[in-house]
Design a protein with these regions (language model features):
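Terminal, contiguous helix-loop blocks that mediate binding/assembly
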Residues: 1-170
Length: 170
């Protein structure tokens, strides 16, 4: 992979008023021209992280995720981790909130502030050497729904509970 194509995007980062939308557009366009056309990018406005954690704390006090529903989520691992470790945060929220449209609307408004710019190619490349279709991409991956208990020596189902995000959102 090429990483960040600075020759094509640096001008959008280095100006006094960065143009993150154009950065995302050029980043994705760069990868779409490659022989390996796989990429995702999310620009995160960190001043909204605590607000999102507070909203998710309210949600997690009311709703409990059933890992049997993980198949409904956008997998961002492909075949690398089994069971999946990383899912799309937006996919998770949409499924978790279910029919609570008021809460989901609040989430969407906050998410638009937290991730004002995002982009993805039609597929992503996985560490296992396979590709995964991207049907939904919010700009953030999340491991909260993961039931992975030990692949590669990491018990994600337990380790995720030791993160600052988990403490702030549960």
């Amino acid at each position: 992979a090429d990483g960040m194509p600075y020759a094509e995007v640096f001008q959008y980062l280095s100006s006094p008023q960065p143009n993150f939308g154009q950065l995302v557009n050029n980043y994705i366009a760069h990868y779409q021209r490659q022989s390996y056309p796989y990429a995702t990018i999310g620009v995160i406005n960190t001043q909204y992280i605590q607000s999102m954690a507070q909203l998710m704390k309210q949600v997690n006090a009311t709703y409990t995720w059933n890992t049997a529903n993980n198949h409904q989520l956008q997998d961002l691992d492909g075949d690398h981790f089994v069971p999946t470790v990383y899912f799309d945060f937006g996919s998770y929220a949409r499924t978790l909130f279910g029919s609570n449209l008021a809460l989901y609307s609040q989430y969407q408004t906050l998410m638009a502030q937290l991730v004002p710019y995002k982009g993805n190619t039609a597929y992503i490349y996985n560490a296992s050497g396979t590709t995964t279709r991207v049907n939904e991409f919010s700009g953030i991956a999340i491991s909260a729904p993961s039931a992975n208990t030990g692949q590669y020596g990491y018990n994600v189902a337990l380790l995720k509970m030791q993160t600052a995000w988990w403490a702030d959102s549960h």
